[in-house]
Design a protein with these regions (language model features):
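Structured binding/interaction patches within domain cores
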Residues: 2-129
Length: 129
């Protein structure tokens, strides 16, 4: 798929769809619920001025951040699922920040670009293998 032909909204929708596919690999109910909350917020990325920050908080939070969960995970399938979910939320977070006019982004979000879709798709492939 040629990502460059998609609009920003279509890219966000694709990222969310890939994140939802990856979320199916989690079996902990609390984690599944938190991921679902993040993906539901992502679906409203352009409806709230602080959506970028709220989405980023799901990624980088000392108590319940997705990156912390990923670092503590030992199951390779779930690590790859986290890769996809984190990438999806990061991409949508960046679009939400940009939509709201924020000029200075958190460093991990600043480097996000369309190449992240290759990483998400590869992570999903690794989940299935």
């Amino acid at each position: 798929m040629d990502i460059s032909r998609l609009s920003q909204t279509e890219k966000c929708n694709l990222a969310i769809e890939l994140g939802e596919r990856a979320a199916k690999y989690f079996d902990n109910d609390a984690i599944k619920s938190q991921v679902a909350d993040a993906l539901n917020l992502a679906k409203m990325w352009n409806e709230s001025e602080d959506a970028g920050e709220l989405l980023y908080d799901f990624l980088d939070n000392e108590e319940h951040g997705f990156t912390i969960y990923q670092e503590n995970e030992e199951d390779k399938i779930k690590i790859n699922a986290w890769n996809c979910v984190i990438d999806a939320i990061a991409f949508v977070s960046k679009m939400a920040y940009l939509e709201s006019g924020i000029k200075y982004l958190p460093e991990p979000i600043e480097i996000v670009d369309d190449d992240i879709f290759d990483h998400m798709e590869n992570a999903l492939r690794l989940c299935r293998n």
